[in-house]
Design a protein with these regions (language model features):
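Residue-level signal for inorganic ion chemistry
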Residues: 15, 26, 57, 86, ...
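Glycine-rich active-site/cofactor-binding loop and its immediate structural neighborhood
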Residues: 48-89
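Acidic beta-strand-loop-alpha-helix segment within the catalytic core
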Residues: 72-167, 215-236
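Alpha-to-beta junction loops
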Residues: 173-178, 201-202
Length: 236
């Protein structure tokens, strides 16, 4: 079944079951670590797993195959491990700090492919993904809409994919140049942050400041476009 947390924010039985299974495994394998998960799990700890059991729930609820789990291990605002999965494409993305970012099949049985962002350095050649806050009446939403229009004019093209996690994976894999998102929470981002960074990308807020787990406006890029995007995204 589907529950509506708000007019546009949904949760399915699958979210809840996935969270239960992920939490069970993490508690068993790393009992000393904390866990924060989107659907309510909260165990304290110095090192904390941040879990979105199904990033892209709206997509999933419409049978739109662009969604998957996102898991990051954090020490404060530092991400130590990141894992994302796309069950519909049999793709597993993963990174450990200082060891690069990789993609493999879901069972990790093939030869891992090292990930690297693109070197595109002009906006009109760049493909973007975007994310919006749930509250369509908020100023944050209206500002993001203005930024979306600017990006549409200046870029090769822009998408609104419905999954922050897989958008981050696509930046790391060189499939898109940037993900620009407003209203995203830590559980949306934690699994993919390190994967992008280890693939050579850059992550800040819209003003170019370092991110924290409390950041709500995210600029993720291949790095070469970053300064140009900070200027483009400014709103007086």
């Amino acid at each position: 079944g589907i529950e509506y947390k708000s007019r546009v924010d949904v949760v399915t039985d699958t979210d809840k079951r996935c969270e239960e299974e992920i939490v069970k495994i993490l508690r068993s394998e790393t009992p000393d670590f904390g866990i924060i998960a989107e659907e309510g799990t909260n165990f304290p700890g110095e090192k904390v797993w941040i879990v979105d059991p199904l990033d892209g729930t709206t997509n999933f609820s419409h049978s739109y195959p662009f969604c998957g789990p996102s898991i990051g291990l954090c020490l404060g605002d530092e991400v130590l491990v990141g894992v994302l999965a796309d069950p519909f494409r049999d793709e597993l993305y993963f990174a450990a700090k200082g060891n690069g970012a990789y993609m493999n099949d879901l069972h990790n049985t093939g030869t891992p492919q090292k990930l690297s962002v693109t070197s595109v350095d002009t906006l009109h050649k760049a493909l973007f993904s975007s994310g919006f806050p749930h509250d369509k009446e908020s100023q944050m939403f209206k500002n993001m809409l203005e930024r979306f229009i600017r990006l549409e004019y200046e870029s090769h093209s822009i998408r609104k994919t419905g999954s922050a996690a897989l958008s981050l994976a696509y930046v790391a894999a060189g499939r898109i140049e940037s993900y620009v998102a407003s209203g995203q929470h830590s559980w949306d981002m934690a699994g993919g942050i390190l994967i992008v960074e280890e693939a050579g990308g850059k992550i800040t807020d819209f003003e170019g400041h370092p991110y924290t787990m409390g950041t709500r406006e995210w600029l993720i890029s291949n790095g070469t476009l970053h300064d140009t995007l900070v200027e483009l995204l400014k709103i007086d």
